[in-house]
Amino acid sequence: MKSVAIVGLGWLGLPLALHLKELGWCVKGSKQSPDDAQKLHQLGIETYPFSLSDEMKRLPDHIRPLFNVDALIITLPPSRFSSQQYCEYLAFLANQAKKQGVQHLIFTSSTSVFPDISGQFDESSQLSAETEMGKTLIQAEQCLFQSGISHCDILRLAGLIGKQRHPVKFLAGKRNLKQGNSPVNLVHLEDCIQAITALLMNPNGLRTYHLCAPIHPTRAEYYTKAAVFYDLSIPQFECSDSDPKRIIMADKICRDLGFAYRYPNPDDMLEKRSDF
């Protein structure tokens, strides 16, 4: 039986773990809280209380089995850390994984590694982040590619949508929102899970892939439609011809792995109200 550890059993990591368990994988994972770890044990996921910190570098003996797996998936964002801290912690995780014979590492990065300017950005485009998170992720990607693990995949995710998570919740009723004519770059949770599974099943050296729905309505068009669908106050956008037309190109994974988006159109990501 193949085994995998997911560092970060959160909004993406937990449903991914449950999906892989259904496919017959032996799944381990981590949560910050011992209470949360115990709850996930009851779901059949071997869960360890573990968080990125200086303390983790002492790696207590009861945590070591987390790294005794075939593959390691890291889904933790850098939001709580300085760039230096985050990269040091990821380097430590990768080093521990390599020491214990892990052959495959998958890291969920973000399309924020690209600037908010007009253009089409694919996996070969020059990285030039504008946000601190984006700059940190660029360093993290480089760090993990240099880890020495045989197979390492960087999966850059566009804006995330899924059960009980939709950007319109935060935009509803707001006025004077910028860049109404800019296209959206979004991806559904289910597509994230399916893409990571495809990578897991097909390790093949060092790879970078984007994940983003191939249809890109404007922000004003899409979030107006979403607000109407969910019966929320319609957000008011300022629209200009000069709004940046930033498009994330994400068809390489389709060509290389035969991946097919279940949600190619953001309109299809609108869920029934009971799940919102």
Predicted regions and their residues:
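N-terminal Rossmann-fold NAD(P) dinucleotide-binding loop
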Residues: 13-14
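Conserved N-terminal Rossmann-fold NAD(P)-binding element of oxidoreductases
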Residues: 4-8
